[in-house]
Amino acid sequence: MNTEIKYLELLSKTFKNIAETSTEIINLQAIMNLPKGTEHFMTDIHGEYEAFNHVLRNGSGTIRNKIEEAYGNKLTENEKKELASIIYYPKEKVELMQNKDNFNIDRWMITIIYRLIEVCKVVCSKYTRSKVRKAMTKDFEYILQELLYEKKELANKKEYFDSIVDTIISIDRGKEFIIAICNLIQRLNIDHLHIVGDIYDRGPFPHLIMDTLAEYSNLDIQWGNHDILWIGAALGNKACIANVIRICCRYNNNDILEEAYGINLLPFATFAMKYYGDDPCKRFRAKEGVDSDLIAQMHKAMSIIQFKVEGLYSERNPELEMSSRESLKHINYEKGTINLNGVEYPLNDTNFPTVNPENPLELLEEEAELLDKLQASFLGSEKLQKHMQLLFAKGGMYLKYNSNLLFHACIPMEPNGEFSELFVEDGYYKGKALMDKIDNIVRQAYYDRKNVEVNKKHRDFIWYLWAGRLSPLFGKDVMKTFERYFIDDKTTHKEIKNPYHKLINDEKVCDKIFEEFGLNPRTSHIINGHIPVKVKEGESPVKANGKLLIIDGGFSRAYQSTTGIAGYTLTYNSYGMKLASHLKFISKEAAIKDGTDMISSHIIVETKSKRMKVKDTDIGKSIQTQINDLKKLLKAYRIGLIKSN
């Protein structure tokens, strides 16, 4: 009781009397009855900034829905298309129209402003005026409020309304106002953004994606396997650093390292030329961009360094059971073959100038110095560390949100449907306990990052999360990087998916996972990414009778020939859940000039029989707790237990 009174006394410092407390209760109770805000789910972006940015701007088709709601048949299809294009790219679209010959730009702007106001009214209708005001550009806050909340239809308001718009145009602020109202529409169209892993990978602009995400307040991120790789690199894990650089070389993306994050690759390039200058490096030509001998040499040089470091990490962490990644130890350097599980395979490349056959995992002094310098660069990159800070502040292994369970790849399972056990640090963990333990270890590694000698085990474990058999982020038995480079026999390349990926077609398995995480099996969904959905082969993103959704459909251009589409995204609003299937993104220029969009179709996953309100959400539960506390404070004021100020 004393604790409760102390809490109420603390609360009374904010709500100082009966009037203030009552007002807050009324306000919160009103919010509870507003429609639930729209959640937007995206995954496996893989550095494809332009496509990601476009999907954010169009809200996976929800902007078009708002235009339809505002105008129905009052506008032609081309007019709706133009309006959508303006909302997505207001600055660029206005500038395009301004450069048209013999075009009345003022009249066009007036028409567009009126249309945007109607769309904005629809978007704002599910929010309080306070929330809408906070989302407004300060320069136009008062004008926007007047235009949004005044009724133009009233005779005594029409002239007032029209004069505001006319003045905006006459003082040459039309472009800025259109940008402001379009930004407001975009900002309020999506109430909460979920990124279900893999911001990083082969695409060229993950840093721009991170910059964009930093602008979102209502955001969460579930770490993907490529994200954890960059986290490990940023924390000084040398195996992760080697993998990151190798992948950047593979896809000709060294600009990410050098230009975006300020990591100096010149000493590494010099090293690669010294040892591989006369090597054609046929298996190491860049997959994208201009073919370059130097990039191929760097690619091979870092691959060999990676195989050495991974072997050393495996040796010093035998409990991780990663000995299969000690590949260089299994090579017969005289015969040019490798022994895998008792079978001898010829190598397609036997030039290993930096490998000592007597001690193949030993780093050359130059390699060790190079890794030390690269480690210092990753640890010292201000922008990289800032981006990793965002991944820790907003991210984690999984999230429970509004009866949905979000995680990137899998919960490791056995073929019989039981959760797999993994020995981590001090014991065996499985299911939810494993996810929580991993989250804790990664955070401990982050807090110890400034002293690379502290808790090496924590930092080493991050490499296991990238490539380990029971890693919830990897979801396969083994990563066959060496085999794919050096062995032509493709049977050695096969990576077997964790049983989870087959078992999730069974509703009972999904129910088991819901129960493990304390969720109601009747109302919950699992939302995953990681495994591209092969739509052109008839595969569906909806599994287990709608209980599980896989929304990786191929943002990455490299996967689009396999999937047949350019990705899935998911929206969850007050009416239910809807999957959007995306066409390949042509270009930002085409979207601006021709109104080209990415949405090809929608799949209704779930329709609510009764429209969901804020009170039906996790935020609603939190607000209800606040209301209950305020009612206690109100009672305390009325009976004199706490003095009213």
UniProtKB/Swiss-Prot annotation:
Transmembrane intervals: none
Please, one GO biological process term? gluconeogenesis
List the GO molecular function terms.
Answer: fructose 1,6-bisphosphate 1-phosphatase activity
Quick check: keyword Hydrolase in the entry?
yes
Read off the InterPro entries from this record.
FBPtase_class3 (IPR009164), Metallo-depent_PP-like (IPR029052)
Give the EC number(s) under which this enzyme is classified. 3.1.3.11
Q: Would the keyword Zinc-finger be found if you checked this record's keyword annotation?
A: no
- Gene3D superfamilies this protein is in? 3.60.21.10
Concerning HAMAP family, the annotation shows: FBPase_class3
- Record Pfam families: FBPase_2
Protein name (database record): Fructose-1,6-bisphosphatase class 3
UniProt keywords, alphabetically: Carbohydrate metabolism, Hydrolase, Manganese
- Reaction catalysis annotation: beta-D-fructose 1,6-bisphosphate + H2O = beta-D-fructose 6-phosphate + phosphate
Q: Which family does it belong to?
A: Belongs to the FBPase class 3 family.
Where on the tree of life does the source sit, at the highest rank? Bacteria
* Cofactor(s) needed for function: Mn(2+)
User: Pathway, according to UniProt?
Assistant: Carbohydrate biosynthesis; gluconeogenesis
